Amino acid sequence: MDKHTICLLNDSFPPIIDGVANAVVNYAENIEKHHGHAVVVTPAVPGADDSGFPFPVVRYPSIDTRRLVGYVAGYPFSPETALRVREEKVELLHTHCPIASAILARSLREVVDAPLVLTYHTKYDIDIAKAVKSRLLQESAIRALVQNVNACDEVWVVSRGAGENLRSLGYEGAYTVMENGVDVPRGRVSAAAVAAATVGYDLPDGVPLFLFVGRLMWYKGLHIILDALRALREQGQDFRMVFIGAGGDEKEVRAEVETLRLSDRCFFTGSIADRETLRAWYSRADLFLFPSTFDTNGLVVREAAASGCPSVLIVGSCAAEGVTDGRNGFLIEENAVSLCAKLTALCADREAMRRVGENAMRELYLSWEDAVARANERYAVVLDRYRSGKYPKHERFSDEFFNTQGDLMEAMSRVAEMRGETGRLRRELREGFDEAREALREKLEKEW
């Protein structure tokens, strides 16, 4: 298969880490290693060092809002960025975010003459609802998001559930399910590695160990876990529960553990960045508890499966796609009673947990190498369709575009001093694009 130069865009990238940033890193590394050349375009972050990456990282101007929201707000018009991408001879643009990165990708498309693919990773309507209380602003932001999605030549989603969420926002076009992979190898770690990673925790042999890995946010189903564990203890069942991760609700979660008198059986490790240490915890656990309906692509479920740890999931959730109850995972209803009943049955059948874990390792695991190979095959289809003129022409930016995108960036910024300034943001979007377009035209004219 021919090798191509792919430009990957996202609003977050190391040193800012989240699931989508991790996906972009793995896309870029595997494209560079196996399929051609990758270029990453992302907002500038003070102090970021990109020298260790085996591919170029192009940073565009941003506002540092990490202290308030944990992210930088990218300013998506930059003639320097456009010229740099043009110099890389980019053949396809792939944005992993429908906000600033999508706006930038839409403007770059005019410069590099390349098709634009978007991957929809997460339920942005929930993020928008958390960011702003104004119903009108929420609706305007969602319209802008859908506008960006509609402007792409091809839309990918990480799961069927992600596609359904996108449909619920008003998107009516086609989409392709393109699953993400995991960056851990298949197989359990050694007993010595498990002992080293878990030293200091009260984890008796023969006592079931349950595990949660992810952001400590209530919407991840943590109330269901804690209420089920309380009921399990009241039944006289011994167990241990380990929470790995951090998050905005961590203090409340810890307090609830104390209130429910579970602190002698529930432990918090904080975030664990080392992948081998994380593999050791997956290898030690009997069950991975993930009763979340928020996540569009439960990569942690596949991480657990890589180490032979079966998951307990909500029936019909995105994380449960591909899971058959009692075969390669366990399914419950979205309530603590159902989870407690499942845990009670499984604590009495440790062999079932082991057997289902082995099946999960064989059937659910997907490496990033295989995931990006699938994406690369689809890139070839997109390029062929684009070069054959099979994609419709897209409209140039309009006044409505600048108005709605101002609302979207306002909503997603979640920065107090930027609230109520949609007019300024709209003007800056309009002025920024006009200035960038003129500057780019001047530079291109000089080159030609």
Language model segments and positions:
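A conserved mid-protein helix/loop that constitutes part of the nucleotide-sugar donor-binding site
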Residues: 22, 208-231, 237, 241, ...
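Carbohydrate-associated surface elements
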Residues: 44, 161, 181
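Aromatic "clamp/platform" in nucleotide-sugar-dependent glycosyltransferases that forms part
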Residues: 293
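Nucleotide-activated donor-binding/catalytic signature segment of Leloir-type glycosyltransferases, i.e.
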Residues: 254-272
